[in-house]
Amino acid sequence: MHAYRTHTCGQLREQNAGETVRLSGWIHRKRDHGNLLFIDLRDHYGLTQCVIDTSNPNFGTVEGLRVESVITVTGKVVARTTETVNDKLPTGRIEVQVKELEVQSAADQVPLQVNSEQDAGEELRLRYRFLDLRREKMQRNMVLRSNVIASVRRRMIEQGFTEFQTPILTASSPEGARDFLVPARNHPGKFYALPQAPQQFKQLLMVSGFDRYFQIAPCFRDEDSRADRSPGEFYQLDFEMSFVTQDDVFAAIEPVIHGIFEEFSGFTGVKKSVSPYPFVRIPFDEAMLKYGSDKPDLRNPLVIVDVTDVFRRPDVEFKAFKGVIEKGGVVRTIRVPGVADRPRSFYDKLNDWARGLGAPGLGYIVFEGGAGKGPIAKFVPEAAQAALRQATGAVDGDAVFFVCDQPGPAAKLAGQARTEIATQLDLIAKDRFEFCWIVDFPMYEYDEERKKIDFSHNPFSMPQGGLEALETQDPLTIKAFQYDIVCNGVELSSGAIRNHRPEIMYKAFEIAGYAAEDLEAKFGGMLSAFKLGAPPHGGSAPGIDRMVMLLADEPNIREVILFPLNQRAEDLLMQAPNGVAPERLKELHLKLDLPKPKIAG
């Protein structure tokens, strides 16, 4: 017989009755019934009820053990009586009568309960992550993650991609987030950087003559935490393709993403539908207008409409809106069907919500009995109300909510209002995954803080119209061959057709204020490669963590990462980041210049 187990704790069934077996695992629960002690023994695979009676010499030993102690039991499988069957467990029709018992590891008092789903607080859970990971939900989430990655690999290979590993130690680059820097001991004053993404390396692979690359790539960014973003590191399905258009990239990755979500869409116990591919494509400008976001949740049926022209009419006397419009502002509205009978408190609550975001409120008109009602209805005459109905599709029984501001802030608040209203009314469908592509991103944006034009997103994107567009168009009108894939309001991936021609790259960076010398200093390796024959290429990088988060229906990405950092980018279990000995700093030629501690009061 094996030293530790003949079966797992999730394996035994009625047909095993009469067998002598050996199991090993953690004590999940103990129940003392006087002459009998019941133990729920747990391993990765499940639970088995074990029974030990007072005649067993090990009874006292087990009685003194705490939950989470690790034991090995040997005993006989017996069928449970009808009244003691537990059909909630796969092993619930049998139990093991313990004959022998060995303590492998006695546990101290545990700081959090593994056998309970009660929230212990994130700080405690992360400090004792190894205990937290013993819980059934966490075990299932991590196995889901493993299975998703295995499925991704299989599907990418079936699509003709080859997996390569790119360097972890590289050069710092001026991408979006801060780099994590690693001092180079043999090169005083110089640093490696952990890659924010394998961006340059995967492009160099295309220049090297490889046609379709992918990897499950670790990425490192020194950025703040969010519910859908873990600080420090994350993993993405990084891929790149040669001699492709944007359509080719979409056609390659859509079956992979769709297949993953179809395969695992029933993970939570409720099978969700997955939008078919080809996925809907929405231009960036349209997304910002209709949804107030470049990450629209298409499960939400509400749509934003621009009604600036209605409030610009001479017969509309609402000066609060007119004054903003005269200064270049816009009016956006959201039609909400069937809420005319809602009490005044519904509208007041939404106004309070908007004020909490720093807005003056949400104006609204309720349509009933052929007329508009509400605080601003008296300023909008019948003809203008008819124009509002036509623009929004509103009918009696509906309400329309208004946001008025400069275009950027108006789009943002309208998008937030769209989500808030749909959430309050429970309009967002929970039974499906809705995918879309956001395309035609602006190549550049105006940086108000620095008073200059800069790249809007990825500086390596090919501008639509190529060199001619860069030389003849207003930079703020140029679109890029850049795209995001979005699911249920979560950005899964950014990608682009790359700028592989040096003359176009020099001009693109010049417009953003970078001299040729700057470009060569930062991206010299890639530029020199492009000057020696580079194919047109493009790719993307869907986030593994975010895909698993959606499939597991978890609101926080840390629920699908084994050992995540907390919101302050600390590893509470391993006590990282930590200080290092002075001699280590000396050999790295570093001196600390720490901020002075703040004086209280």
Curated annotation (Swiss-Prot):
One of its GO terms (cellular component) is cytoplasm. L-aspartate binds at residues 175, 221, 457, 498. Its main location: cytoplasm. Residues 199-202 are annotated as: Aspartate. Belongs to the class-II aminoacyl-tRNA synthetase family. Type 1 subfamily. Homodimer. This is Aspartate--tRNA(Asp/Asn) ligase. The lineage of its organism: Bacteria, Pseudomonadati, Pseudomonadota, Alphaproteobacteria, Rhodospirillales.
